[in-house]
Every structure is written in structure tokens, then in C-alpha cells.
């Protein structure tokens, strides 16, 4: 099976963490709809919402305009959505885009010149207990049970989650992130690794046998930045752009 090529003009965006008072992702999507941003492909690297799953009615209803707009854009644009630790069980929302749950990540693509590219949200390679505890929190049984209780409590659980996540600090520095990235690339066989999740916005070129490149996409929620793919001298590069100052 041939790998999907990442096209020149593709756009990467990660960690928008959209909530009641954070609307940058909505503006970004509408800039695409209006034609002011014209991606050849759109890669959503997860945590696009502070919380969203198919089984949680409060969040599904709150973000329904986003869901409809993303699916509408997917009619004419290849959209690849990598579920994160804040947004999962999304497949039943969409007809026109490709969803990659955490169990399928990383997903391997390739550049236009044949270099392999592994893409993931980033919350993978977890310790055994943590991995399966988080998978349980994503089960249909657990989420439907919580949703049932939430309805009885007039959405107090969902509103509490929203309020707590809204206060969470998203702009932080991980001091030893180079070494964390170095350990992560050792788990990959691909030439280029692209992840979100860590909120660091760093690129590292490792002088290992594979000469791997690690790219951590900057947090859209903090920097309002997205990244456009360009090719030069048979190499891929991600060019940073900002939506600040762009009118929808």
C-alpha cells in the first residue's frame, strides 16, 4: 500500500484547545472557508478542543458548528485529524475527513520526494498502566455513564471540566525537551517525525544513523500559528504563519 504524500501547500495546526472564551480555531476555519487560507491538505494534530467526544452531549452540542464546518471543508480539502488526549471518539461526527484514533498513531506519510514522515498527536509510548487507564476513559461505557450522570446534574460535570481547563496554563517550557525528543525519535523508524501535544514549537536535527528530524508543532491556542509545507532542494520545511491581523 503506497503512502500518502504530503503536498506543497499543506497546512499543519495543533493544540487549539478551543473553549468558551478561546475562538482562534473558529476564526482559522472560517479563513479557510473564505479562501484567505488555501491549504492543499489540512493536518489537525489533536487537542483542537479543550474537550470533545461523541458520547458527551454537552460538548458535542457546544462544538456542533465547528464539526459541521470541518466536515464541510472536508468535501474539497483532504483533512486528516489525529485524535489527542482532549478530543477522541470523533469518527461518528464526520463523513468527509479521515480520523486517526490514538491506537492508530503514529501514521506514516511521505514527502513529495519519498522521505518517510511519522505523524502523531504525541501522547503515545506511555507506561503500561497509564496507557490502559487512558484507554478506559475513552470507552463507550465510561463516557456514556458520565454523560448520563451529567444530564441528571444539568451539565454540572461538563461545565466544571470547561472551567477547569480554561484556567489551565498552555504556554510552558519543558527544560529538557531536547533529550525527551531524542528519546522519542529512537522509537521511530521514519526520517521525519511531526508531533503536537508538548506545546514547545521546536525543531531538532539529530545526528544519528538515520539523521532524523523531530518537529513539534507550536500550540495554536497560545500563538495563533499554523504551518504551511514548502519544498526546497528535495527537503520539506514548515513555514510559520499567524492568523493575527487576518479578517475572516
Located regions from the model:
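Core catalytic region of metal-dependent phosphoesterases/phosphodiesterases
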Residues: 3-9, 13, 18-112
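Active-site metal-binding loops of divalent metal-dependent hydrolases
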Residues: 14-17, 47-48, 85-87, 122-123, ...
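Conserved beta-sheet core of the metallophosphoesterase superfamily
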Residues: 98-104, 114-118, 123, 128-134, ...
